[in-house]
Amino acid sequence: MEVCGEPLIRAAPEPLRDERIQTAELLCADLDLSVSLTPERPADRRRRQVRFNVDPVLITVNPEPRNNQPTARKPPNKDEHGVETDREQSRECDGQQTHEAELNTTLALRAELEEEAEQTFDAEKAVREKLQSSTLTKNHVNSKAAEGLNFPRSQQLYRALVSVSLSRDQLISQALQDRPALAPPTASQNNKFSSPPPEGPDILQFYSPDKMLRETPLLPGDHIPLPRPRPVPRPAHTTFHLHRLHKLWES
């Protein structure tokens, strides 16, 4: 209806109030989402605006050190009903399980054992490394070095030394002594008509009469006396027989 061209404005009736809301004790004043039954409000009261935060909540999960005692998980609150899926996705992306038990693994030890089994054993290298790290070997080397360095003054450090101040005659005599003995000459130096040297090696070069051995046969009839030789008579016409044969051969 319009009165004199102006609309008639009626006041809206006051809504029924719930006594339980007034008497009940609210857990949190910020979570009071109670609204009136009708959207209309009296003109003298300001309208209440209710806003909701719809931004997604980003939560980062940091891995915590695992203990032997299992940690108790808290039940999810009502406000975190939309965050559980984000947590599960973040765990899958990280690839880490923070609240689950993990078995002891021996894969690294197995790989090391397989690598050692594939390698060939070098005995010489092992002995060399053992000698380098051996205390007994070091002590033995130190003792030998001490014996070579620590010597009394009365003892000669060097042996079989040769003097450098020698005369010419001493050097010649020493050289003749050190010179190996040569084989004696086959021909005499006093022989004027010396024969030419043979083409082959001389067999008598190493001949020694003292080392010469003679062998005699041992026959079974050695003890039997042998007959004495006697001249055989020849006829007289054979006296110059050989001389005649020579004459014939020469002619």
Curated annotation (Swiss-Prot):
Keywords, A to Z, come to: Cytoplasm, Cytoskeleton, Protein phosphatase inhibitor
**Which InterPro entries does UniProt cross-reference here?**
PPP1R35, PPP1R35_C
Entry keyword annotation includes Heme: no
Question: What is a single molecular function from GO for this protein?
Answer: protein phosphatase inhibitor activity
Q: Which Pfam families match?
A: PPP1R35_C
GO CC terms: centriole; centrosome; cytoplasm
**Gene Ontology terms: biological process:** notochord morphogenesis; positive regulation of centriole elongation; positive regulation of cilium assembly
UniProt main location, coarse:
cytoplasm
**Tagged with keyword Membrane:** no
Which residues fall in a compositionally biased region of kind Basic and acidic residues?
A: 76-99
Where in the cell is the protein located? Answer: Cytoplasm, Cytoskeleton, Microtubule organizing center, Centrosome; Cytoplasm, Cytoskeleton, Microtubule organizing center, Centrosome, Centriole
Which residue ranges does the record annotate as region Disordered? Answer: 58-99, 180-235
Q: Which family does it belong to?
A: Belongs to the PPP1R35 family.
| Known role | During centriole duplication, may play a role in the centriole elongation by promoting the recruitment of the microtubule-binding elongation machinery, leading to the centriole to centrosome conversion. In addition may play a role in the primary cilia assembly.
Q: What is this protein called?
A: Protein phosphatase 1 regulatory subunit 35
